[in-house]
From Swiss-Prot:
GO molecular function: RNA binding
Stretch forming the signal peptide: none
Gene behind the chain: matK
HAMAP family: MatK
Organismal lineage: Eukaryota, Viridiplantae, Streptophyta, Embryophyta, Tracheophyta
GO cellular component terms given for this protein: chloroplast
Family: Belongs to the intron maturase 2 family. MatK subfamily.
Coiled coil: none
Keyword Membrane: no
Name of the featured protein: Maturase K
Naturally occurring in which organism (per UniProt): Saccharum officinarum (Sugarcane)
PANTHER family linked: MATURASE K
InterPro entries membership: Domain_X, Maturase_MatK, Maturase_MatK_N
Physiological role: Usually encoded in the trnK tRNA gene intron. Probably assists in splicing its own and other chloroplast group II introns.
Keywords: Chloroplast, mRNA processing, Plastid, RNA-binding, tRNA processing
Subcellular location: Plastid, Chloroplast
Length: 513
């Protein structure tokens, strides 16, 4: 059977941008350094607890590990496993992190080269804007107002190790590297708990999030690319022009070959993709599929997705992982926002000459709110408040200087307001700001062994300025004579920023210290 052209072209395009270096050698540092997005600056890597590791550190770790010859020692001395010696926890975790970071750099090189090889310079700023997490919300607001049903999909697991390794075979042609990756995945003791966790597919161990998230996203992208290919090809089946007619003939021939291998599956489901109003969004371990079709069509989509997973990825998908809801009667958690599309009823009084009548107008509105309970729980886990939201001091930070404590609390508050700037209602944000401000005051008072009121009176306006958000800073410039003011005038204003490239730490499992 002939392969789909689009699928093979995708593989060729990925191979075109990749030079295959030997894994764990010094050449990787030079390669990643020269093509880094930061130019002459060392490439920064997010590792344990979201701390940044420069490429210079990775280079030193790779050279050190390469000189140790761990694999040779494991063959000559099988009883002395120096790479994953669980009797020495420090070295076991240290070298497993080296392996994870090293593999993460290598497999991400093709993606960085693909971004830098843009033929037109004018498209680069536009592409960088689309990298922002907030760029998806205007799209949802524009599209979801015209849709009827929403499917919440939990992406299936567990993922077989061999499938993850096979996905990298066309990116890395160095066979020893693939064997080393397979050895690392099978030997790593926490692998089962990382991937098959019942709570979330993204509750990975912090030291190895970079590699495992990349492997997971590569795996899911193969799943999504096939659906996208069928969507694009089937959309031209309705057209009758001469150019698309040839494409229909070619695609129909491929359907015949495909039906031989998977009888009764392809022909019955290809018409699902002809829906002109169908949108798919994935975030972390979940996905959303919205459509304007009927409830019967959505139920058939649910059956199709379950069968698709069994045919192509060889695992059982539980039907209850796909939930169907009417868009106007439900809300969904999306990237930390609680989103919904309610119907607002407006009564308009119309006066025509001597007669007057009321017009009942129904309008849909895309709302994005801040979930209060999860964020208060995150602050509680970070020891900023109790479970009920009562602010407490953070004893761990009492050894820092006063300005460092103020800066840390202020930065967390500003980041929260920056990330949730698109919220329709900001009452929850001001509640979180109150918790952080009072927790900061109690931490400083505990450090200096004084009361909160005495310490806040001594700092005065300096203490309040550390918790100013971007909107409040602009507002304060307009009224420079006023120090104390209440900034609640723009609670319904939504601002989407194009510089947010990752989810806030308080939305994900906490990594705050």
């Amino acid at each position: 059977m002939q392969k789909f052209e689009g699928y093979s072209e995708k593989q060729k395009s990925r191979q075109h941008y990749f030079v295959y270096p030997l894994l764990f050698q010094e050449y990787i540092y030079a390669f990643a350094h020269d093509y880094g997005l930061n130019g002459s600056e060392p490439v920064e890597i997010f590792g344990c607890n979201n701390k940044k590791f420069s490429s210079i550190l990775v280079k030193r770790l790779i050279i050190r590990m390469y000189q140790q010859n761990f694999l040779i020692n494991s063959v000559n001395y099988p009883n002395q496993d120096r790479l994953f010696d669980h009797r020495n926890y420090f070295y076991s975790e240290f070298y497993s992190q080296i392996l994870s970071e090293g593999f993460g750099i290598v497999v991400e090189i093709p993606l960085s080269l693909g971004q830098l090889s843009c033929p037109e310079e004018k498209e680069i700023p536009k592409f960088q804007n689309l990298q922002s997490i907030h760029s998806i919300f205007p799209f949802l607001e524009d599209k979801f107002l015209h849709l009827h049903y929403l499917s919440h999909i939990e992406i299936p697991y567990p993922i077989h190790l061999e499938i993850l390794v096979q996905l990298l075979e066309y990116r890395i042609q160095d066979v020893p590297s693939l064997h080393l990756l397979r050895f690392f995945l099978h030997y790593y003791s926490n692998w089962n708990s990382l991937i098959t966790s019942m709570k979330s597919i993204f509750l990975l161990k912090k030291e190895n999030q970079r590699l495992f998230r990349f492997l997971y996203n590569s795996y899911v992208s193969e799943y999504e690319f096939f659906l996208l290919f069928l969507r694009k090809q089937s959309s031209c089946l309705r057209l009758t022009s001469s150019g698309t007619f040839l494409e229909r003939i070619i695609f129909s021939g491929k359907m015949e070959h495909f039906g031989v291998m998977y009888p009764g599956f392809f022909r019955k489901t290809i018409w699902f993709f002809m829906d002109p109003l169908m949108h798919y969004v994935r975030y972390q371990g979940k996905a959303i599929l919205a459509s304007k079709g009927t409830l019967l069509l959505k139920k058939k989509w649910k059956s199709y997705l379950v069968n698709f997973s069994q045919y192509f990825f060889y695992f059982w998908t539980q039907p209850q992982r796909i939930r169907l809801n009417q868009l106007t009667n439900s809300c969904f958690d999306f990237l930390g926002y609680l989103s919904s599309v309610p119907i607002n009823t407006l009564l308009v009084r119309n006066q025509m000459l001597e007669n007057s009548f009321l017009i009942d107008t129904r309008m849909k509105k895309f709302n994005t709110t801040v979930p209060a309970t999860p964020l208060v729980g995150s602050l509680s886990k970070a020891q900023f408040c109790t479970g009920s939201g009562h602010p407490i001091s953070k004893p761990v930070w009492t050894d820092l200087s006063d300005w460092d404590i103020l800066d840390r609390f202020g930065r967390i508050c500003r980041n929260l307001f920056h990330y949730y700037s698109g919220s329709s209602k900001k009452q929850t944000l001001y509640r979180l700001k109150y918790i952080l401000r009072l927790s900061c005051a109690r931490t400083l008072a505990r450090k200096h062994k004084s009361t909160v009121r005495t310490f806040m009176q001594r700092l005065g306006s300096v203490f309040l300025e550390e918790f100013f958000t971007e909107e409040e800073q602009v507002f304060s410039l307009m009224f420079t004579k006023t120090i104390h003011f209440s900034f609640h005038g723009s609670q319904s204003e939504r601002i989407w920023y194009l510089d947010i490239i990752r989810i806030n730490d308080l939305v994900n499992p906490l990594t705050l210290n």
